Every structure is written in C-alpha cells, then in structure tokens.
Amino acid sequence: MNRVVITGYGVTSPIGNEPETFLESLKTGKNGIGPISKFDVSETGVTLAAEVKDFSMEKYFVKKDGKRMDKFSLFGIYAALEAMAMSGLDTSQLDVDRFGVMVGSGIGGLETIQNQVIRMHDKGPERVAPLFIPMAIGNMVAGNIALRVGAKGICTSTVTACASATHSIGEAFRNIKHGYSDVIIAGGAEAPITEIGISGFASLTALTKATDPEKASIPFDKERSGFVMGEGAGVFILESLDHALERGATILGEVVGYGANCDAYHMTSPTPDGSGAAKAMVLAMEEAGISPEKIGYINAHGTSTQANDSAESKAIELALGDAAKTAYVSSTKSMTGHLLGAAGGIEGIATLNALQHQFIPPTINVENQDEAITVNVVLNESKEHKFDYALSNSLGFGGHNAVICLKRWED
C-alpha cells in the first residue's frame, strides 16, 4: 500500500483566491458573506451570499474561455492550476497515464442551464447554444482540468451534493493508496449563486433570510436559521509518498483515512441521532489506524441549519466518545458560506492549514451557542493548538456522508 501525501492545493473562495490570503482569513475570522451582487434578489427573500471576489480571469484564461465554459469550470481550473504551481509538478516529467483528475460538483453549470432555458423560451429551441451541454454537465470541470494539464489517467466527477468534493478526495486517496495512480488533482467546484439556485434552496427553506452578514451563517448558534450559499473551488494535489520524494516535492500533509456511507433516512435531512455521520467518522479513523483521542480538530459540516448542526454534534459525540470533550470543532462555513459540492474542497484545505500552522479556525459570529450542542466549538477567534490528526466532515442531501482524516507532516 502507498502512503498518500498532499503536495499542493488551490482555492477560489469568498475569503481569498491565493493561499496566503486564504490562510490569513482563516486565522483572523474574515467574513466572506455580503449582499448578492449578481442579480435582483427582491422576490426571493434571500439577500446574502458568499461570492468569490477579485477573480482574475486574466491569470489563466483568454476571453473566449468565459463563453465556452461555465463559471464552475473556470473556478475549478483556476484552483487546479494554482495547486499545480504550488506542487512544482512538471507534466513533462510525469507518466501522464498515471496522472488523474477527480473533481466533483454538486450542481454543475447551473448558470448555463438557467440562461439557456430562458433563451429557448424567448427565442426558440434553434437558438440554444451549441455548447450548452458541455458547459452544463457536471463532469466537465474534471474534463476541462484534464484537458488543460494533460492528465490522461483516471478522470471522474463525483456528484453527491454537498459531499462531492470530500468523496472525490477520498476516492483519489484510495486510488493512489492501492497503486492505480501516482498523482491526482482532487476536490470540488461550484457556482450556484444564480436566480434559480437561490430560489430553489429558498423554496426548500434551507437558506437563511437574515439580512445582516454578521448574523447569517452562524453554525451551532441557538438562532441559526439556514445556510448562506457560497461559490468557488478547492483542490489538492495528492501524490504517492514515493513519487513525491523521488521528485523532491515539498510535502504539506498526509491523507491517512477516508470514511463514506449513507444515512438511507431522508432526501434532505440527516439522521437525527447522527448515527450515519458518526459511522463515516469511525471508518476514517479506522483506516488511519488511530483512536479517537488522537483527533485534535474536526472541521464540521456545520451548515447553520437547525437539523444539521444538532445531528452532527451528536455524531461527533457518538464517533469520539469521551474524546469529543477535548477535540476542538469549528465550521468555516461561518466565513465562506456553503459551497455545496465544493465545500469539502476548501474545508479540506482549511483543515490542512490548521494542521500545518497549528491553530483552530474559528466559528465566527456565534453569540449564543445552542445549549443542546455540547461539543467543543471554537467560537469567534482562532485558537493556537498542537495536534497531529484532524477530520473534515461533509454531509450531503441524499444521506451522503464523507469524511477524510488528515495527518500533520513532520520532516
């Protein structure tokens, strides 16, 4: 079996598109949530989202790329190329048949779908764009990344709603662990902040209608009222340890465990007792070969909905037992909003940053922690902490649970 290490990462997020900016935002508790600027929100009752700011198209794209790819693909490619640059990978020195891409998306090209349905309605079916399908389908983020970097190995795009990125990272970990690939770009990308996206989740009563960005995404708070939609991408460069050492790569961390299962309970609600998510955490720790006492931090799914935060708190206590009293928990969605299928990508990166720099990112804007949530939540300010192992949880509609276990790298 191969050990699997992280040698690079890239982010496109509401709190920064460069590694240094993203890290500083995590440490200082920057709020990436604000008024929706993309369209008129007056009829939806939802006014806030976590939009990507200062996205530099010019860095990696030409003008026509914006007309040939949906924004979720652009976000994913940007993050992948940033990760490649950090890792120092030279594709001319790789066996490209063992170089893969596993980048998921929960919804895919939602903006493209919306625009083309309107176009067909207004102008007729013959006016639908020829590239509508390849712009809209969710797998194209992985396909477009592979095209851009020349990766000819495994290329998949997992669709498991809000667990998509974490499933992609976990499956990439297993693929390398069992010897099928040397290097895989793994994570998720999403661009759901559209009229139809906001309206759909609002109709489901999943989104908060709070109008104050400081009181909107408040995981574990007694007054939480729904999640704030976000957008962006987060990807890792995963690599076998032997391959990384052979090329002299800088190793940032190690993936040591992965757990995945299904609640088989409800279309959109988690198992109230948290048993499904708990089992996924246990599976990740078992593969890592560690006891719950070793876990120093859990980056919770923590959506700021009543159902999720209550169930996940119970899940952590079920999975860790007495160790849940000492493991620190936070939800970085309080800063980034909920990136749906990309959430596990940027949250995995946040977890890696926490391990590298030995701190716990805060859950910001929490004024009154729900007394029924008794896990050890780090509130409002980051906390210095020495630890070696962490979990990153992602729980999706459909009952999908995915958890990765990361280990701090010691030279």
Language model segments and positions:
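Condensing-enzyme catalytic core mediating Claisen C-C bond formation in acyl metabolism
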Residues: 3-7, 30, 34, 212-288, ...
